[in-house]
Amino acid sequence: MKKTVGPAVILVIILVMFYIVFNRTAPERKAVEVVFYNVENLFDTVEDTTVWDDEFLPDSAKDWTQERYQKKLTDLAKVLTEISEDDLPEIIGLCEVENRQVVEDLFATDSLGKKKYKVIHEQSPDFRGIDVALAYDSELMSELYHEAIRLSFSFDPETKTRDILYAKLLSCGDTLHVFVNHWPSRRGGQEQSEPKRLKAATVLRTKIDSILLKDQKAKVIAMGDFNDYPNNRSMTEIMNCEPGANQRLKNLTYDFHEAGLGTYNYRGEWGMLDQFIVSDGLLFSAAGCATTDSSVAIFKEDWMMYFPEEGSPSPSKTYGGPNYYGGYSDHLPIRLTLYCD
């Protein structure tokens, strides 16, 4: 008797063949780690008469010596080395750096020097002498363009603050639009200081909108210490990135805020000041670089923390006023994982 092959068997064979072909030809997606870290006053020990760096000199009340500076570099490098699950991070945004040289010194440390980072930095007019910076793995990506976006306030023209750093990077054949932020502080209270952050949000959102107008699927990452929480007006009304349908931007750290987690501990309460905001083009991309709304983490290890005899632990900071504690930073870093073809 002649045996026949039934439709069910044929279907199974076809599915198996598709599985084999797909798994042979589909490229493995590479994990690209993006990190943001407020490094708490990374100053060198050299006097710069163009900025106010008097606190961070060897003869200052803080006694900021070369030995302490080198320890700070080593400590920060340890954090940035440990934060990535596999290799060193591919993109690192920093704030509270004095100048380009301190950033170059950081990436010249033994552990970070293993990767060929290139630094993007522009000197800002900030009255404290602190800037933002970006470093990227030059063997994986390249810079197409960058600019420092200046912030000014018509209602307070004397205030000078740090720029927003924008970089256009080519990564794995895909274009990433990256913004590094350190918005004006909450000094003087939330109500008094909020207008400056609302202005910063307006400037950032306008720039992002100009990119999305040219390319609706543009892949945008805005990271930084925004000095606002995910539910503050700058985020919900101007950036318009709170959870919700049909929004072009999404704050990936909103759920941390809702859960009472954070990157900065103020008087025993955690606040999610450091955040990642991404465009829907990055969230819903089938090709190139993509991410998910669960691909963000706060990096928090016991060795980075200060454990008081009473009260809750907080990030182990370098200084408290003039008192030297020798810690890493008063902020915790955050990490975003991209998946690139």
What is each stretch, according to the model?
Residues 2-110, 114, 120-130, 309-312, ...:
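N-terminal, active-site-proximal structural segment of metallo-dependent hydrolase catalytic domains
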Residues 5-26, 210-220, 228-341:
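Metal-dependent phosphoester-hydrolase catalytic domains
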Residues 101-104, 128-131, 187-190, 229-234, ...:
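Extracytoplasmic/secreted cell-surface and envelope-processing proteins
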Residues 34-39, 64, 69-72, 76-103, ...:
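Active-site beta-strand/loop signature of hydrolases that rely on acidic residues for catalysis
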Residues 58-67, 88-94, 121-122, 153-154, ...:
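Second-shell loop/turn segments in exported
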Residues 50-53, 174, 179-193:
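Active-site His/acidic residue clusters
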Residues 39, 97-175, 179-183:
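Structured beta-strand-rich core segments of catalytic domains in phosphoester-bond hydrolases
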Residues 26-30, 85-86, 111-113, 125-129, ...:
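Extracellular/periplasmic catalytic domains that process cell-envelope and extracellular macromolecules
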